[in-house]
């Protein structure tokens, strides 16, 4: 607390946290609906030239939701890169409000150069690159954590008889499992496999499970130049349409895109 009774603040905070945990599973669908509506209204921070640093997908408010999901004991949340990204977005908003003298959250074009200069970036392009990268990191962390929370909720649903999540074959050893694409077996040391798996999952509009991404990231790099099979698969991946963005986000966070 900035001022006031520390014990009172701690008591209120504890009561609110208890109430949130007690009702979080019932409130989760409503929370996700509101989240999707807000993202639709304000767009994707990583893809917007004049982003709303607070309300957009990948913005500051999404970090609040991320923390709330973890505080509800629905799932763990990632740390490290997402915390750094959040701090960078806070710095941008602070600089924006210093430059404009107002409590703004939208980074307008007219403020790009001044904010970049205040934060020590060479130009507005460097600033926007950082904002986009940070927004992408926060968005991916939130989306993955929200999926984990949904999976946790479904796992606790009472069922008659033993519960076993179905594996739906998608092809090439890839399966759909609880809303994600997973590999059915430990991958062989095939550097083309990440592209093959990405194409299958993107066509099904499914994100890759974190464990599968980690396994793919551990595979060796593609040779230079790429073999024809890899080039054809990469072309197929770019042509997968609406399923590509969620797939690309996972590949980026796993550093696979950087290695290509």
Where are these regions (language model features)?
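A nucleotide- and high-energy phosphate-metabolite-utilizing enzyme signature
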Residues: 1-260
């Amino acid at each position: 607390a900035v001022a006031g009774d520390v014990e009172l603040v701690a008591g209120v905070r504890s009561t609110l946290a208890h109430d949130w945990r007690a009702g979080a599973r019932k409130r989760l669908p409503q929370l996700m609906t509101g989240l999707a509506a807000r993202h639709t209204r304000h767009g994707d921070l990583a893809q917007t030239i004049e982003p709303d640093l607070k309300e957009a997908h990948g913005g500051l408010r999404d970090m609040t939701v991320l923390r709330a999901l973890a505080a509800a004991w629905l799932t763990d949340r990632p740390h490290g890169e997402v915390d750094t990204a959040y701090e960078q977005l806070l710095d941008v908003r602070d600089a924006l409000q210093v430059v404009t003298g107002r409590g703004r959250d939208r980074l307008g074009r007219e403020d790009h150069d001044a904010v970049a200069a205040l934060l020590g970036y060479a130009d507005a392009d460097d600033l926007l690159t950082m904002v986009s990268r940070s927004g992408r990191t926060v968005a991916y962390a939130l989306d993955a954590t929200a999926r984990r929370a949904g999976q946790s909720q479904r796992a606790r649903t009472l069922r008659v008889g033993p519960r076993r999540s179905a594996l739906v074959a998608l092809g090439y050893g890839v399966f759909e499992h609880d809303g994600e694409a997973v590999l059915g077996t430990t991958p062989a040391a095939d550097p083309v496999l990440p592209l093959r798996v990405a194409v299958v999952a993107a066509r099904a509009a499914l994100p890759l499970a974190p464990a599968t991404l980690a396994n793919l990231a551990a595979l060796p790099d593609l040779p230079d130049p790429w073999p024809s099979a890899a080039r054809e698969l990469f072309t197929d991946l770019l042509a997968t349409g609406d399923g590509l963005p969620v797939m690309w986000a996972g590949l980026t966070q796993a550093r696979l895109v950087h290695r290509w």
